[in-house]
Amino acid sequence: MSFEVGTRCWYPNSEAGWIGCEVTKNDFQDGTYHIELTSETGLVIPIETKHLESNNAMENNHEFLPVLRNPPILEATHDLTTLSYLNEPAVLHAIKERYNQRNIYTYSGIVLIATNPFDKVEELYSSEMIQAYARKNRDEMAPHIFAIAEEAYREMINNDQNQTIIVSGESGAGKTVSAKYIMRFFASVEEEHFNKEGDSKHQEEMSDIEVKILATNPVMEAFGNAKTTRNDNSSRFGKYLQILFDSNKNIIGSSIKTYLLERSRLVFQPTSERNYHIFYQMLSGLSSDMKKQLYLTNAEDFFYLNQGGESTINGIDDSLEYSTTIESLSTVGIDTEVQLQIFKILAALLHIGNIEIKKTRTDATLSSTDPSLQKACELLGLDPLTFSKWITKKQINTRSEKIISNLSFNQALVARDSVAKFIYSSLFDWLVGNINNVLCTSQVSETINSFIGVLDIYGFEHFEQNSFEQFCINYANEKLQQEFNHHVFKLEQEEYVKEEIEWSFIEFSDNQPCIDLIENKLGILSLLDEESRLPAGSDESWTTKLYQTFNKPPSNTVFGKPRFGQNKFIISHYAVDVTYEVDGFIEKNKDTISESQLEVLKATTNPTLATIFEFSEAENKTNITEQAGTIQRKTINRKPTLGSIFKRSLVELMETINSTNVHYIRCIKPNTEKEAWKFDNLMVLSQLRACGVLETIKISCAGFPSRWAFEEFIQRYYLLAPTDQWGRVTADMEMSLEDMVAFCDLILSEKIDSKDKYQIGKTKIFFKAGVLAYLEKIRSDKVTELAVLIQKHIRAKYYRSLYLQAMLSIKNCQSLIRGVQSRQRVDFEMKTDAATLLQTLHRSTRVRSQVFETLKNILEVQTAIRRVLVSNFIQREFESRSAIMIQSKIRANSPKHRYQTLKTGTILIQALVRRKQSQEKLKQLKIQAESAASLKNSAAGIQKELIGFIEELISNIKENDAKTTEYKSLLKHTSLPVVTGTNERTAAYISTKNQVEEDKVTIRTILTKYETLKDLCRKELKSLESLEKGVNDEKFASSLQSSLELIKRDISDLRINAIEKDNERTSTSSELKDGTDCTDNAVVQILTKRQGDLINDLVNVVFLEFQIPQRGRTKDCEHFYPVKLLISIVNLMNKFGLRKSSHSILKQTVQDLIGKISSMDAKKCVTFGLYWIISLHKLSSLPQEPAVLNKLQDKFYKTWLKQCFNQMKTVDSILILFDTISEFTLFFQGTTELLTNIITALLQHINAKWFNDLLIKQNTLSWTHGLEKDSEIKKVLDWCNSHKIRNSTEYLRNVNQACKLLQLRISNISDFQLVCEFCYDLSSLQMHALLTKYRPTQFEKPIPVDVLNHLSNTARRERTTMKRELTLDAGTETYSVENLFQGHPIEASDEHDDINQLINQLPSDKDFPVIKELGSLLA
């Protein structure tokens, strides 16, 4: 080993396991190395040793040498096998660093290490994450449990080989949750596969199967999981779930195998632990009536439930869990009636625990009237008398007789508990069998082609007191570890052979002696079974046999006897030595009930319980038959012990695993407090040793633990080759495999002294431990040397440029000084001349102002005198007129009184006469139309009467035309006598025609009066305005102001009504004027009766076949010809009152434009959409349901934006799109504000799109990504600045700040805080996502760990408080036409466009019959 000053290393520590240190001193004196290590906390550790190549404490004064540490670039690697120094602290530190970065998964070769976060991380298992890992190789994505599941699924499909995923770890490490997510992945990936193929029938079938498979989890957890001190949901059994596939790789079913249910938990629970979940769910979820039927109360009232203390779990609602369990039981085929029977059995077990057995001097007694006994027997359907008898007695069968004896108190308790355990274990096995019958029917069994097994099994257990359960669990882990070691060893050797390198046999510690100790013919299990079959067998005698058999060579290497006590034995497992307490081994191994008790249970009247016992008996017969087939002895009819059953099931499991392709997941529990994101070094270290990860690493270290591909090695270490060889790498020249091998060999042969430290294979280079760290060190030295050389040349060039710039500045400064002096001299002469001129002008101006001031004073005096004289004259005149007016009033008072009296009488008489006339007229008016009344009261009445009269007149005209036509035809085809007979009809026609003429004269008279009324209103308005201007008295003007405003509003209303009446008059006059030739009638008929043809011509021909005007035309009418034609026709329809038809035309036009732009070519879409966005804006001036038109315009605008978004693939395509929009916006007479709004919308989309790409699509980021994206942003901003787009930088601020974040250097938290002030728009969650993906380049240092930890804590707080989204919205929902044209007034539609001229411009090669006919009528 090399311990030069500056070497980073690890030193053992009792609190943290290992601490990071750096060598600060290394002196060699008197044959001893004096080394000083400085830890990260500043602690100095002195070490004295005589050998640097030994870690033997005996040779180094009981001091261990430190372990070398990996370079920073390798410390947080996602695969532990890539570490240069593959040792215990390096592995621990790598897992911890990834855990602190919220990466809970790490690869260790073929093993996935999963560290429990104790936090909700649902985003890691979302459907998006499943899709991301589907159909991807494991090396393409970050470590994840889905990568292992995908690898198993693809290998099963591609290689047609069964797969097994082994999920192991200690209680609370997350095994059960990991197994759940694996099952969810298989169901989701398989369903996605058939969704794409469109197999709807299969989707329905698979959804039912998937629901049943997933429903097994709540059932198995309720009956097999319990709360322990380490885990609130600890699995107390092993489970091997097989997901079955047919030949088409469809999921067709599932099968479950269970191992070693912890039966003793039913009758005993340690402090702070609980019994199985189902009991507490039953007590919380059952109704009150059902509880009364089952005699259930609270958990504290039952002995089997109150031993552990607390009966609840924080954060868990047992009533909700009960509902989930009930639903799952129904899903897997257990109906409500059977569920009720199951709850009866469970309630009976609780009552059995409360049976009170009384103790006497030598034996035990149990009354058949015990309340708990009566309740239990009632629920189980048993006889209380016989049941109580065989709880306290036993029967021994001899050849000649049967001997019945009493049991002691302790034996009676054991008998009672054995019955309860037997019933519960039988119920559990029956549930598993029932589930297998539902999920794996005979039809499914015939179509099974392959399967993927998920083994969720207990990890290595080592407590203060270890009993039979821990012995079986550790025995299973020994078998699995042996298989795992052989598997890893096999893979290592296969890769060496495949790469054709020189290698020697890898030695590793085999645990076969420990397995032989347990399972040999004279092993621990065999002796245990032998002792269990003896009537007088005991734990003490069995322990004595163990000591006599194994406490001697060669078995004493793995078996030991404790120094004190005779009730323990020690086994040296692969992980750690475990001391087992022998108390209870014999009883737990038997774990059965007497024949008498079994006969009592078989006599049950409970049908479900009878079925359970039948199933259990059938299973026992199967086990006995299998045992008889392998061992032909007279004892084959004996009941199998629990140990033999477990051994046989374990052998079957290993055979199954060995026949499949195995994948490994090791779950790690980071702390005992279950605190989120807390990492306990010592606890994790012990689990790494227990789960075999470190043993695997030792196997890898024995060979070549590090391996690099040729291309990766060249890209990283080409700097170590001579400089003349760099060109082939830096110029990106393609190198053949032979060239790459030669290049790698050139570097290695020059830098590494021994070829034993590396081997060059066919595709990779294999390195011994520590070689990569050495190469990294000399590469770092080389980079430093080259950096110094580059700095030297750059500084020389820099200072030379400063010198040349200084000389140039001096010369420029001299020239500027001379120029300034010359300008100052000329400026002085010019100022002198200007001063002389100013003095002259000032003197003349002062004299002129004095003359003007004198004249002004004279005029003011004259004005004041004249004002006084005029005022006096006006006062005298006012007094004179006032006196005359008073005299006139007095003289006129008497005649006026007489006149008023006469006028009052006259008015009274007139009122009475008018009243009589009005009453008569009222009777007549009631018969007429109601519009006559409104005609007297308002101008609106005149309008209605006029419209009615016009309609009647038009109908009369049509009738007269018809009669005229009839008359002319009769005149042509009828003889003179007949004509003579029609004279009366002719006379009637002439009379009617004369009446029409009179009506026309009447209408013209009414219109003339209406025009006179308008003129009077206008004159009144002018007189009032002149009156307002002519009044000089301020008080009088203010008093008239309010009256003037009211009069103005009335006149304004009259103007509006006058305009409307004028339009109606004009329309009516034209109809009356041209009524004889029926021109307007024909136009109305076209616009009403032929609407469909007109809409078809306008929409389907003119607009959809119209081409965008080519550049070069300048007239507005040519640009916007289609929309002008549409506006003209709509105005024409409004003129005739056909607004409903005009609505249909507008809606159909916009909807067809939306359909066309959706299917249009991308190149034409930009100009076409831009043209119609501007054109459709002109329609907003029409009074045609503006809300509906705006909605259609918004839809058209958003559709056009989506088409533009699809074209923005690269920065060049973005600039081309911007140029096109800019050019055609101005070409179509759009404003610069409109162009700015459109570009702003596109910039917002670019900001969201580029920012989201950095967050999601990029797996890794570096400063080059930021530099490239920054250059693209600069191109876009340069374009915006050149086209005067305001605030363009603000719309790209998110992606711009993200690029700066990737480019800025962060060396400590202070730097990071400065970066946060610059990146103020980025949340902590977004910065954490970016920096987590950041990977330093070869010249960079990685981001410090304390910065990442600080950012992680900030992001977690922000996620829980602010609820901010990680990504930006890149959709079109926020864009609208109202925002696009905000601040731009709507251009009024030009009603003076010559519609006939527009219609005549139609293409001559097209046939538009309705439009051309309309044009001919309007010509």
UniProtKB/Swiss-Prot annotation:
This is Myosin-2B. Residues 75-780 form the Myosin motor domain. Residues 1061-1419 are annotated as: Non alpha-helical, tail domain. Residues 4-57 form the Myosin N-terminal SH3-like domain. GO terms for biological process: actin filament organization; endoplasmic reticulum inheritance; intracellular mRNA localization; mating type switching; protein transport. Residues 451-531 are annotated as: Actin-binding. Pfam families: DIL (PF01843), Myosin_head (PF00063). The gene is MYO2B. It comes from the Eukaryota. ATP binds at residues 169-176. Belongs to the TRAFAC class myosin-kinesin ATPase superfamily. Myosin family. Homodimer. Interacts with calmodulin (CMD1) and the myosin light chain MLC1 through its IQ repeats. Keywords: Actin-binding, ATP-binding, Cell cycle, Coiled coil, Motor protein, Myosin, Nucleotide-binding, Protein transport, Repeat, Transport. Myosin heavy chain that is required for the cell cycle-regulated transport of various organelles and proteins for their segregation. Functions by binding with its tail domain to receptor proteins on organelles and exerting force with its N-terminal motor domain against actin filaments, thereby transporting its cargo along polarized actin cables.
